[in-house]
Amino acid sequence: WIMGHMVNAIYQIDEFVNLGANSIETDVSFDDNANPEYTYHGIPCDCGRSCLKWENYNDFLKGLRSATTPGNSKYQSKLILVVFDLKTGSLYDNQASEAGKKLAKNLLKHYWNNGNNGGRAYIVLSIPDLNHYPLIKGFTDTLKQEGHPELLEKVGYDFSGNDAVGDVAKAYKKAGVSGHVWQSDGITNCLLRGLTRVKEAVANRDSGNGYINKVYYWTVDKRATTRDALDAGVDGVMTNYPDVIADVMNEAAYKNKVRLATYEDSPWVTFKK
């Protein structure tokens, strides 16, 4: 999965997919009442990027739905996975469940079109704080209450705070999650970060009894870093330059080892070599 980083304006969806991304990451900010409000990152953000692009969250969802609904004039068949980077740092811990409920209602209405031929992309809810694990239950309970438990087949989870792998496992246990787990590891492109924790996450994924299904590394903009990440066995790389990742994947060392994921590749099933 080549994951386009910080895709917060609707026009950027096409821009990143046309550069080679089959997945995008979108920031979601919340208002004081835990309503998802804008697709917005703000300052500071990655080096070389504008931090200030934004849409109203519901408008972005409608644009995303168009891009991921077969038959729509804006349809992009390659776009199969969307990571919502939930900026829950602005919320009190006791608002996490409420944020999950509201997120579920927004997605159900504006993205899934109330279960009637909505967008088809898989969704990952990425949460920066382990203490906000109740967001997951708020989300899953709401989809069930609204009569659409089947949509949970399209939803996965990520804790993005670079916490110890054992602590992340405990948070999932509390949230009642087993399966559909992506594990991110990374840092802004302005700084360097080694692959120690990525390798630990990959080992958990491949152990047969770990909690992780897929591992992605962010933010990868350089060819050398891309090679290191691919060598470490990641499933996804998040990048500001999808074309760079695509180029590396076409190099002799990689073109017979890795390929771009398609809609038929489940993002929840651990790939067995």
UniProtKB/Swiss-Prot annotation:
Protein name: Dermonecrotic toxin LhSicTox-alphaIA2ai
A single cellular component GO annotation: extracellular region
Primary residence: secreted
Cofactor(s) required for function per UniProt: Mg(2+)
Disulfide cross-links: 45-51, 47-190
Binding site for Mg(2+): 25, 27, 85
Pfam families: GDPD_2
Record organism: Loxosceles hirsuta (Recluse spider)
Subcellular location(s) of the protein: Secreted
GO biological process: killing of cells of another organism; lipid catabolic process
UniProt catalytic activity: an N-(acyl)-sphingosylphosphocholine = an N-(acyl)-sphingosyl-1,3-cyclic phosphate + choline; an N-(acyl)-sphingosylphosphoethanolamine = an N-(acyl)-sphingosyl-1,3-cyclic phosphate + ethanolamine; a 1-acyl-sn-glycero-3-phosphocholine = a 1-acyl-sn-glycero-2,3-cyclic phosphate + choline; a 1-acyl-sn-glycero-3-phosphoethanolamine = a 1-acyl-sn-glycero-2,3-cyclic phosphate + ethanolamine
Active-site residues, record numbering mapped to chain: 5, 41
GO terms for MF: lyase activity; metal ion binding; phosphoric diester hydrolase activity; toxin activity
EC class name: lyase
Annotated family: Belongs to the arthropod phospholipase D family. Class II subfamily.
Tissue and organ distribution: Expressed by the venom gland.
SUPFAM superfamilies registered for this protein in UniProt: PLC-like phosphodiesterases
Physiological role: Dermonecrotic toxins cleave the phosphodiester linkage between the phosphate and headgroup of certain phospholipids (sphingolipid and lysolipid substrates), forming an alcohol (often choline) and a cyclic phosphate. This toxin acts on sphingomyelin (SM). It may also act on ceramide phosphoethanolamine (CPE), lysophosphatidylcholine (LPC) and lysophosphatidylethanolamine (LPE), but not on lysophosphatidylserine (LPS), and lysophosphatidylglycerol (LPG). It acts by transphosphatidylation, releasing exclusively cyclic phosphate products as second products.
EC number, as in UniProt: 4.6.1.-
Cofactor note: Binds 1 Mg(2+) ion per subunit.
UniProt keywords, alphabetically: Cytolysis, Dermonecrotic toxin, Disulfide bond, Hemolysis, Lipid degradation, Lipid metabolism, Lyase, Magnesium, Metal-binding, Secreted, Toxin
